Amino acid sequence: AAMSCLLEVKDLNVHYGAIHAIHDVSLNVEEGEIVTLIGANGAGKTTILHTISGLHKATSGNVTMEGNNLLKTEPSKIITLGMAHVPEGRHVFSQMSVEENLEMGAFIFSKDKSGIEASIKDVYERFPRLRERRRQLAGTLSGGEQQMLAVGRALMSHPKILLMDEPSMGLSPLLVKEIFKIIEEVHKQGITILLVEQNAKMALSIAD
């Protein structure tokens, strides 16, 4: 069966002030794929993700997801279309508990309490370590656990596609393996992944 295109980026140009950061980038992400953007740091890969998820304005080009023009869509609305973004540097709410962090992930789009509880349960099944630490402040977790939490929080919105920016950044080789295992498991559950990664070897080992 032909895969359907979930996300299409066409002739994307992005400026930061006078700097032309993204130059005519086009890419297609088919449903069910893992697509990896590899390149030297500062090569604008993060900017591509930010532009796709509505955090940065494009100068020209098109970004469409299932027929929706993302360049004209609010970031909060993009989440409800089924896109979740795990930014680089493991952004967690450090003064909140693990569980509160997960609730924040759901809060943006859902006020349905039983639904949120079921989603949290799903995340805990995927990441038993987060369940063990659910009352702990996120800021006291290890780097690897914070990355798990960042992924878990993104999954709370039941995304069709997950954008991940440098998930291996600053983690030990052992944890990098663990994070990539997590990415593969998430992918097995039918979630499409667009990954920015400097660790080319790891990234290529899982990319389609």
Question: For the regions a protein language model found, what residue spans apply to each?
Answer:
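Conserved ABC transporter NBD signature motif
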Residues: 61-69, 81, 115-120
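The feature captures the beta-strand-to-loop junction immediately N-terminal to the Walker
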Residues: 38-40
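Helix-to-loop junction immediately C-terminal to a conserved catalytic motif
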Residues: 53
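ABC-type ATPase nucleotide-binding domains, specifically the catalytic core motifs of the NBD
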Residues: 17, 35, 73, 98-118, ...
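ABC ATPase signature
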Residues: 96, 141, 154-155
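A short, proline-enriched helix->beta-strand linker immediately N-terminal to the Walker B motif
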Residues: 156-160
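Conserved ABC ATPase signature
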Residues: 137-141, 145
